[in-house]
Amino acid sequence: MIKSELVARLAQANPHLYQRDVERIVSTIFDEISAALARGDRVELRGFGAFSVKSRPARTGRNPRTGEPVHVDEKSVPFFKTGKELRERLNNADIADDKLMVDDSDDGDD
């Protein structure tokens, strides 16, 4: 699924929202996650997973064409660890279909 497909599915599941508003919301979420990671923060979405940044040390690699050693600088890379609920859902044999599932059970009337 690409970003435009995500926006279209969310807009379809929420007909009270305009697609352009959904697109702004999705873009803002991605921008905020990116900004938090750039600051070195961890972003946790309970039940889904956590985004963090890991540091890869400098090392000596090899040029695949020549076999010649090359220096690879230290770098930071994004890392995603799945949450327990997502892992269970992915490993559950009775995943019904490809529909977007929205949990409307908690409507805040408790």
From Swiss-Prot:
GO terms for biological process: DNA recombination; regulation of DNA-templated transcription; regulation of translation. It comes from the Bacteria. SUPFAM superfamilies: IHF-like DNA-binding proteins (SSF47729). The keyword DNA-binding applies. Signal peptide: none annotated. One of its GO terms (molecular function) is structural constituent of chromatin. CDD domains: IHF_B. One of its GO terms (cellular component) is chromosome. Keywords: DNA recombination, DNA-binding, Transcription, Transcription regulation, Translation regulation. This protein is one of the two subunits of integration host factor, a specific DNA-binding protein that functions in genetic recombination as well as in transcriptional and translational control. Belongs to the bacterial histone-like protein family. Heterodimer of an alpha and a beta chain. This is Integration host factor subunit beta. It comes from Parvibaculum lavamentivorans (strain DS-1 / DSM 13023 / NCIMB 13966). The gene is ihfB.
